Amino acid sequence: MSSFKGNQAQKRRLSVFPKGPLEIPSPTEADWPKDDEKDFVFKDLDQELDSLPQPYRMINKLVDHLFNRSWEIIEERDSLREVEKNWIVPAIYHPVAEIQLDKMPGGMAVSHDYLFIGGLKGFSIYNLHNCKRIYVLEKFKADVISIWATDLGNDVLIVPIDEMGIVRLFYLCKDSLYHIKAINEVDDSSKQSTCLKMEISQNGDFAAFLFQGAGDVWLEVYKLPKEIWLKEMEHPQSTLNQKKKAKQLQLSTPDSAVTESIETSSGPSVSSNSVQDLNISFKSDLKLSLPVFVMKIKPPKPIAGTTFKSPLEVFAKVEDYVGLGSGQNHFIKDVQWEQHMETFYASYKKHLEGEWEEEPLSMATFHFFYTNSLTTMSMDVKSSSGIACVLGIHWNGRHNLFFYSLNKTQKDKTEYENVWPCAAPIVMSQISSFSSYLALVCEDGVLILWDLAEGFLFGVVALPEGCFCQSIHFLRFFLVHEGQNVYPDYPVKFEVMCVVLCTDASLHLVTASGTQGPTSKVLVGRPVMHMEEAICAVAPVPALPGMVLIFSRSQSVTLMDVAKAEVLCAFSAPTCHPQALPWKPLFAVSPHHPYFLLHGAHPHGQTTSTEDPKKSTDSVFYFNFEDYLLLKDISKKCTISQMAVNFSQMLPVEKRCEQVFQKSIQMTKTQMKGREQWSRLRKYSIMLQKELLKR
């Protein structure tokens, strides 16, 4: 039995209406009371705290805030402890070899069994299997800052770019190195253009270079006569006789200028199938045929007003409807443009009062495609399979992807044959091997996936809000067989996989299969507490199915399995990079061999890194995946046949018997229903027959 005081206190707590219980209003609104609504709201049970005088009210709020914040920190620490308990430290693998350099390399490229490293006024060629330098060329006017290498069958096309922006073409055939041409080198330095970007088709049939000079930007496309080069090297004497009067190469390297280096590094175990070291020599007396100029492309001009006075005049004089509905070929009068600009300035005048920054030059992204259906080709033009036939290009800040046919001559006009418009400006694009798949990334974070070989749109997927694409990489399609990633050794269609690195350092896996549409999966989330773990670069590893290399700001390198979203191992190499600057890793992954090379630095007289890059020696560290126990089996057993896939999908006998039994039950039910329907139909027909007889 409770006391009287307790009952009184309970009544006071339950009394939340200031004026007693509310009366039931009459049905008509006119009879409702005119009292203020605040008289009927619930009282705040914590109002007594807000009624405290100052400074006690402020002290109470500060104490509450401090207590809540302390509780949040305690919860975060507990969650981190749980993660650390479950965290498995990955195996750390060290490099198997090291290439010591005199200075920081100006780019690296891998092709066939060779490694190319840009350096002091030239580049060096290394044997990829034993890391021995087999040739060095140092006759440029400036240091090389980037270098590319492309397979041309059994030969290699080498394209270095120096600090002056001059791009050169070299051809490596067996044990001979040839200089083909310096694409943009001129005698007058004031007219010298700079190469900003370049792209070579998959088989080396075409090359495109983006140049900048005299306040202008343009793209030049060349056809590479690689078949003619082979014939000229097979019959060098006839070639020399025909080109005896030609101008001598400006770049000549005498044999005495070529020096061999003695490597102090210990090489890895050389496999039995590795190539033998070649004595490469520079052939300065033989001049190969020059690349053939195809076309020059400039950025699209801004839309100007038309002189047509009416739409009828436009339809009467415009015969071509190419680009209809694509945002091109607009006919807008000058008056309309003036009205549009006046409205714009009136709306955003306060934002435009400051100083205007100089508009940057247009930059372009371009790719070579092998699908004829992207352009309208003439019937008499035939394109060989495996040869690039279309160039796709999009300019910064533009909504359109333009397609140009490569089956042109210098007399033809440089006009696009097709255009793909997008709802938002295209900020990035990427193609897969032999341009089978195309990915377009728009400014609004939308990713568009195309199967160009079949002319099929996989669909559109939107990245999470606030995520913007930093880089995108296609992965070769793989299967998970008995817990291991494997490549199918048979053709696969309508299957695409790619990894997307966003600007917030999150990593996503985007997959699409047939008509199901693309889906996105988070592999690595955005770092919140430890920003040094943020991802700065990603690289697929073709030798390991479903594996990607992840480079973090902390200068760590890990290998991730995208199927499980798990880190398998880490790679350790000495690095010497200032902590204040963001790390831009310089690396190269072999597309045909299980090799991976990373630039690093050794401090002088030490084995640990230092923050002073001037007190360190540059090196390129060599990693062979097959030398590591965890990755050896994955690299050697990376393919699976279609028969093995079908056999693994076969059901056991018990499952098959159960399926047959279930089907027989369903058939029995269907037969019973059919008999019932037939009996009802017979009864109904007999009843109708009796009714007819009565009439």
UniProtKB/Swiss-Prot annotation:
Question: Its GO biological process terms?
Answer: electron transport chain
Pfam families to which the protein is assigned, alphabetical: WDR93
Q: In which tissues is it expressed?
A: Testis-specific. Expressed in spermatogonia, spermatocytes and spermatids.
Query: Which region is the signal sequence?
Result: none
Q: Which SUPFAM superfamilies match?
A: WD40 repeat-like
* PANTHER family in alphabetical order: NADH-UBIQUINONE OXIDOREDUCTASE (PTHR12219), WD REPEAT-CONTAINING PROTEIN 93 (PTHR12219:SF17)
Please report the name of this protein according to its UniProt entry: WD repeat-containing protein 93
According to the entry, what is the taxonomic lineage of the organism?
Answer: Eukaryota, Metazoa, Chordata, Craniata, Vertebrata
User: Gene for this protein?
Assistant: Wdr93
